[in-house]
Each structure stands twice: as C-alpha cells, then as structure tokens.
Amino acid sequence: MKQLYGVIGNPIGHSLSPVMHNDAFEHLNMDAHYHAFLVKEEVLGEAVRGLKALGISGFNVTTPHKVAIMDYLDEIDPLAKQIGAVNTVVHKDGKLIGYNTDGIGFVRALQSISSEPLQEKRILLLGAGGASRAIYFSLADAGVKEIDVANRTVDKAKELIAACTATVHSVALSLEKATKEQGNYDIIIQTTTIGMHPRVEHTPLQISSLKKGTIVSDIIYNPFETKILCEAKEQGAIIQNGIDMFVYQGALAFEMWTGCVPNIERMKQLVIRKLGG
C-alpha cells in the first residue's frame, strides 16, 4: 500500500516540500506520496487526529503550527521540547512523535561547508526569534562551546541564552556591538527576516571587517544572495544561503520517516531550479 506523507500549514501553496520529497521517493523507487495539506489554526486538532486516523506515516509542520502542534502529539523529542517547536512528526507504533529538524538540519548544512569541526568555532548568531532558538540549541547540542547572540532587543538575546541548559559560553550583544566585533568570529549566522524579498536593501549587520576564512550563513533564500551575503562575499568570506538549511532539514525528516538517506545534492539542485536559479 502506498505510504502517505505530507506537510501542514497555512498558507501552504508555496511549499517546495512536496516536489522535493516526491522526487526523492521516485528516485529511490519507493511507493509513497507527499501531499501539502492546508490546515487553518482553528481546526489543527481535528486535522492531526484525521491524519493519524488515515494512517499517515509522517508529516512536516510549518507556519503557523510549529508550537501549537505540540499539544496534539503523543511524545516530543527532548531537543524539540527545549526548542519549543516541532516541524517533523513521525507516526510510529500508533504514536505521533514530534521532532525539530530545523536546527539539526542547519547544523548539518553548516558543517557541509566548513573544513573544520564546528565545535572549534566561535559563532555569532544574529536574531533571537524561533529560527535562532532552534539553531542555538542544536549547535549547543552538537557540542559547540562559543555562541554569542546579537539582537536589536538585547534582553531577548539574554532570554534565549538563559533558556539553554547545555554548557555554552555565550554573550548577548546589541547589533551595534556585534558590528564592531564581527572580526572576532569564525562563523556569522543571520536568522532574522531582514533582507528578505521585497526589502532586499536591508541588513541587520554591516559587514566591513571579517577575518580571513569567515563563514557567513543566511537562512533566507529569497533572494539567493541577501545584502549581508553580498557584502561578506566582497570581503572574501565563504557564504551560504537558506537553501541548504531547507534541504538538510527535509532530508533529515525523510531519513527519520523512511530509514533511507536521500540524495542531498539532487534535492538541492531541484529546489534551486524550482526557485528559478
């Protein structure tokens, strides 16, 4: 019988997940289908119960349900619980189990472009919202020891740091201070929506004095190169946009559902083509 997978969210028509996962199923000769389900906030509980009754094998969760979904699951992975959000659900032995592959997917994507272990790096995170939280906790879980957080509201950065139970040396900074100290970091990660289409001329941090070999990663992928990435490239930095995070988090979910490892480069090239790259 064909295995059913999917993604729930609102809106959902723009999602590239069905294209990416269905191509992977076809490539691996798997009898499975991935479908996008439009689910409004007021019917989330009913939708989850319906998917469980249908025997769905697993599904992704996107905006605006990543936090609310946690009330309707049988179990939640400890890291996802710490992050406070779920983006992947596995249906196993009659139970819906929630995970967060956003942060771990990002860590894997970042490691793929770093020639050295991330654990040895000094990292600066820009932003203290949901995406930053997932990345911060996942980097800490992976053993990274130095992660500073810069945010427009410094208190929010302090709250994020205080919420993490792992042993990490972290300082909360203003964006102004981070701009002055950017040369002290090996990796800078941009997690806000600043610079996203259509406000492409905006940047949270003016790149001006990076040290040699710095990696600058932006979780935005529209445009492919945000202002911060363009400035970093001019400084000779290694740059990475949000496509890698999207692909790696999807590949990790695929692996958790099926036990099979998809072809990540194939997934990435497909997503780039679909985005017009």
UniProtKB/Swiss-Prot annotation:
Q: Name one Pfam family in it.
A: Shikimate_dh_N
| CDD domains xrefs | NAD_bind_Shikimate_DH
**Source organism:** Bacillus cereus (strain AH820)
Keyword presence, Flavoprotein: no
Group of enzyme by EC: oxidoreductase
Annotated pathway = Metabolic intermediate biosynthesis; chorismate biosynthesis; chorismate from D-erythrose 4-phosphate and phosphoenolpyruvate: step 4/7
Q: How does it assemble?
A: Homodimer.
Annotated Gene Ontology cellular component terms: cytosol
- Residues reported in the UniProt entry to bind NADP(+): 127-131, 151-156, 219, 242
Q: Which UniProt keywords apply?
A: Amino-acid biosynthesis, Aromatic amino acid biosynthesis, NADP, Oxidoreductase
- GO molecular function, a single term: shikimate 3-dehydrogenase (NADP+) activity
The record's section on InterPro entries has: Aminoacid_DH-like_N_sf, NAD(P)-bd_dom_sf, SDH_C, Shikimate_DH, Shikimate_DH-bd_N, Shikimate_DH_fam, Shikm_DH/Glu-tRNA_Rdtase
What are the binding positions for shikimate in this chain? 15-17, 62, 87, 102, 221
Protein name from the UniProt record? Shikimate dehydrogenase (NADP(+))
Coiled-coil stretches noted in the UniProt entry, renumbered to this chain: none
One GO biological process from the UniProt record? amino acid biosynthetic process
Q: What catalytic activity is recorded?
A: shikimate + NADP(+) = 3-dehydroshikimate + NADPH + H(+)
